[in-house]
């Protein structure tokens, strides 16, 4: 077991010395109970982001390596559930049985290894499906000013996947918890939560959790 000490901590970032063999993306366990993820490797110290407040972390406190890469539990049990950026349930429906553990950052497959995009993903919006069709497997940016209907397009697309064998993952970053709760109720009312996972990193969550939220959603999708 390799043990280090905190040099500085603040603004959800900590600098630690004594962890010579720490790896990029590894989870560190602080004596206060807070966990962090290594993001900066230097000859004499490492820098990490904290998945919790830095107020309880003092200079000189103990830090332990876990040997685990930052990841998220995955499994079919996540369908219909609302989780945070670490895969922990936040919908009050109890624990989620996991069937594996995937790193939140994994190498992207090469072009040869990727499956071709050969089937459409219908959004249910005639203007998009007829003029700008989206293929299953492609990435699509929806950009626009506030209150212009970006979320409505994404929500309509999720609702239109019912009965098509598509699993939808909605990652909410920096939104109000009340807005996400309203969205989940809408999905439940339309029967869409049966094939949907919601990852929520609200405005009240730490910047570190908001940062890893899209990676967590991608890991769930890769499963």
Per-range role (PLM):
Residues 1, 5-121:
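Acidic-enriched and Gly/Ser
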Residues 7, 141, 167-169:
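Conserved beta-strand elements of the Class I
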Residues 21, 53-56, 69-70, 87-89, ...:
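Conserved nucleotide-binding/hydrolysis micro-motifs of P-loop NTPases
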Residues 50, 94, 144-146, 172-173:
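Glycine-rich, histidine-containing beta strand-loop boundary motifs that form or position
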Residues 61-63, 70, 74-77, 90-139, ...:
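P-loop NTPase nucleotide-binding/switch module
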Residues 133, 160, 223:
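Hydrophobic/aromatic ligand-binding patch that stacks against planar heteroaromatic rings
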Residues 148-195, 216:
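Conserved P-loop
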Residues 216-223:
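Conserved alpha-helical scaffold flanking the Walker A/P-loop in AAA+ ATPase domains
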């Amino acid at each position: 077991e390799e043990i280090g000490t905190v040099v500085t901590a603040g603004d959800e970032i900590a600098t630690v010395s004594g962890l010579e063999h720490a790896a990029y993306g590894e989870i560190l366990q602080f004596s206060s109970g807070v966990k962090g993820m290594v993001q900066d490797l230097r000859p004499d110290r490492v820098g990490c982001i904290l998945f919790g407040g830095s107020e309880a972390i003092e200079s000189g406190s103990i830090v332990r390596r876990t040997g685990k890469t930052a990841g998220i539990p995955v499994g079919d049990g996540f369908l219909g559930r609302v989780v945070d950026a670490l895969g922990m349930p936040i919908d009050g429906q109890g624990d989620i049985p996991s069937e594996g553990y995937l790193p939140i950052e994994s190498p992207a497959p090469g072009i040869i290894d990727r499956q071709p995009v050969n089937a459409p993903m219908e959004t249910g919006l005639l203007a998009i499906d007829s003029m700008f069709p989206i293929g299953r497997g492609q990435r699509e940016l929806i950009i626009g000013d506030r209150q212009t209907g970006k979320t409505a397009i994404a929500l309509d697309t999720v609702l239109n996947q019912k009965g098509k064998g598509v699993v939808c993952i909605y990652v909410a970053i920096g939104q109000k918890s009340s807005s996400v709760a309203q969205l989940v109720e809408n999905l439940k009312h339309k029967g869409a939560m049966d094939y949907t996972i919601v990852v929520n990193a609200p405005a009240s969550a730490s910047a570190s959790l908001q940062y890893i939220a899209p990676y967590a959603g991608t890991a769930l999708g890769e499963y």
